[in-house]
Regions:
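Predominantly a Rossmann-like dinucleotide-binding segment in NAD(P)-dependent oxidoreductases
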Residues: 123-195
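Receiver (REC) domain switch-region micro-motif
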Residues: 30, 67, 145
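Beta-loop-alpha module in the N-terminal Rossmann-like domain of NAD(P)-dependent dehydrogenases
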Residues: 36, 47-109
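Rossmann-fold dehydrogenase core element
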Residues: 104-122, 141-144
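N-terminal Rossmann-like dinucleotide-binding module
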Residues: 1-47
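Hydrophobic residues in well-ordered beta-strands that form the structural core
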Residues: 92-93, 117-119, 248
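Glycine-rich beta-alpha junction loops
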Residues: 34, 124-125, 148-154, 204-205, ...
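Contiguous beta-strand/loop segments that form the cofactor/metal-binding neighborhood of enzyme cores
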Residues: 185-254
Length: 255
């Protein structure tokens, strides 16, 4: 399987490291903006990537089977759509798209072209999640679920001084909900399905949510998901029932 990577941000080395453990998985190409050329060069030398491009079309012209898209959130739809129309399978970084309608259109288009389209979020495939799902029936009636994903961003100080990275740019669909709280959402919805009601309250700076509290109302119980890029706290999850408690300390994708 031949892979082309779009983007050269912080998540890409993690993807490249993981790819070492997959048989018949060859990273052929990487594409980013001109500003990312030096970083692409470094990655290509370290991981043996043959081709470097600053034009996405050049990457799509390569002999590749799959495109891994790891670029600002606002570009996911556009780049994924082009890849589908070129008959490339897609691994799309989270969040899948900026809007529900964009997600619907990509899924419909992928089905039309017979393309496999994946979102690169791992929570629901890891032992931690599977063990939680296995034990949850022992808790009795669920009453309260609390999740906290707080991570003081390495870009936050620059953001306060006016240097706006994509993760803090409202025009690029950044913010705490899209960047961090999305992990909590996947965990909750994976365990309990869709809520009846949703309320999101956020701390706003420069028109972006730097932290926020998401309340998911399931009728008989409530879930509270906190995502913060402007402060830090121990990462944790509590699922409380009338007969027991599941408590996780650390990121939800840890074992």
């Amino acid at each position: 399987m031949k892979i082309g990577i779009v983007g050269a941000g912080n998540i890409v080395p993690d993807f490249l490291e993981a790819s070492k453990n997959i048989e018949d998985f060859e990273i052929v190409s990487i594409s980013a903006t001109e500003n990312g050329r030096e970083r692409m060069k470094k990655l290509s030398e370290e991981y043996g990537i043959k081709n470097i491009y600053t034009n996405y079309e050049d990457l799509l012209n390569d002999d590749i089977d799959v495109v891994y898209i790891a670029i600002p959130n606002s570009l996911h739809y556009e780049f994924a759509k082009k890849a589908i129309e070129r008959n490339k399978h897609i691994i799309l970084e989270k969040p899948f798209t900026t809007t529900y309608r964009e997600a619907e259109e990509l899924v419909e288009l992928a089905q039309e072209y017979g393309i496999m389209l994946f979102e690169a979020i791992s929570n629901q495939y890891l032992p931690n999640y599977k063990k939680t799902k296995e034990l949850i029936s022992e808790l009795g009636d669920i009453k309260i679920v609390q999740l906290n994903y707080s991570q003081y961003s390495s870009r936050y100080d620059r953001f306060k001084n006016g240097d706006i990275a994509p993760a803090f740019d409202p025009k690029k669909s950044g913010g705490a909900l899209m960047d961090l709280n999305v992990y909590n959402i996947y965990y909750i919805v994976g365990l309990f399905g869709s809520p009846q009601k949703i309320l999101y309250t956020a701390n706003i700076e420069r028109n972006i949510d730097t932290s926020g509290v998401l309340v998911l109302d399931y009728g008989s119980f409530k879930c509270v998901a906190v995502g913060e890029k402007d402060c830090k706290a121990p990462l944790s999850m509590n699922i409380q029932g009338d007969k027991g408690l599941i408590k996780v300390i650390g990121t939800l994708n840890e074992v």
